[in-house]
């Protein structure tokens, strides 16, 4: 039990440290990127370059993920509270969302078509087609 408490404290401490450093960066750079994004970027880089071990943050990260739905309740209430502002700005909000969705679909479709046309994928497709032909 004591070990779990120590792991949770260390895990929360690391996450808060990343957030604190993100706050410092956001305050001093002042380029419009929120401190939480800086903190997440630092956490990602720390995990990627193995400066921070996954086991060190796993305890509090899994706890936060478990209760993530509860963390979104205040945001949802805020959206409902300011629904009139959202509806008045709907044309500004809706157009970029629709355009970015279609652009994402097009780029992913073209990229997947290109990747499947490569020789390694076409070789695998031919192999699967032969196996299906043998079964029939």
UniProtKB/Swiss-Prot annotation:
The keyword Nucleotide-binding does not apply. The keyword Transmembrane helix applies. Coiled coil: none annotated. Signal peptide: none annotated. The chain crosses the membrane at residues 5-25, 29-49, 67-87, 92-112. It is found in: Cell inner membrane. Pfam families: LrgA. It is a multi-pass membrane protein. Keywords: Cell inner membrane, Cell membrane, Membrane, Transmembrane, Transmembrane helix. GO terms for cellular component: plasma membrane. HAMAP family: UPF0299 (MF_01144). Belongs to the UPF0299 family. This is UPF0299 membrane protein PM0880. It comes from Pasteurella multocida (strain Pm70).
